[in-house]
Amino acid sequence: MMTVRIATYEDVEQLHNLHFKLNRHRHQLQPKNFQGKSVDEGWIKDNIKSTHRDYFVLEVGGEIRGMALIEMLENYSIPGSVKYRYLNILDFMIESELDLDTYGHQLLKAIRRWGKDRYLSYIQLNELANDVKKIDFFAKEQLAVTQQTFKCVI
């Protein structure tokens, strides 16, 4: 059985382990930009208690096998731009043994509902350019590239 729910403090250790797997994956894709280690558990707890952030956890067979860290933001207003409140996905991770299309879809469905309940305008996220599997997944879920980030060593 699969369920998606908001994380609690009891989930901190499992979220810590998922962040480790996610950051190890990112490190394999872009070793110059990511360390292959987890995040501080205090940071996870701060996100759980935040009023503008939430963790979603994906449980399969009673075990947490995926997570998403999301936040509610407002875009900056510069002359000529339209101001929006939107949902930003900071981290999105489904364990590699699971089918991303099936389980990721359910996790994203819960995220969309969270955004609609808060009357947010759109979903935004940054994904590594060479994480083809996730890019393909988000494209299937109707997320479109609207900007690109360019980076070079100074």
Model-derived segments and spans:
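Conserved beta-strand in the GNAT
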Residues: 57, 63-72
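Conserved GNAT acetyl-CoA-binding A-motif
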Residues: 115-127
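Conserved GNAT-fold acetyl-CoA-binding loop/helix
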Residues: 24-44
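Conserved acetyl-CoA-binding loop-helix of GNAT-fold acetyltransferases
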Residues: 91, 100-113, 140
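Glycine-rich phosphate/pyrophosphate-binding loop shared by adenosine-nucleotide-utilizing enzymes
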Residues: 2, 62-67, 87
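A short beta-loop-alpha structural element at the N-terminal edge
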Residues: 3-17
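A short helix-loop-beta-strand connector motif used in the catalytic cores of GNAT acetyltransferases and
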Residues: 45-57
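Conserved active-site alpha-helix within GNAT-family acetyltransferase domains
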Residues: 129-147
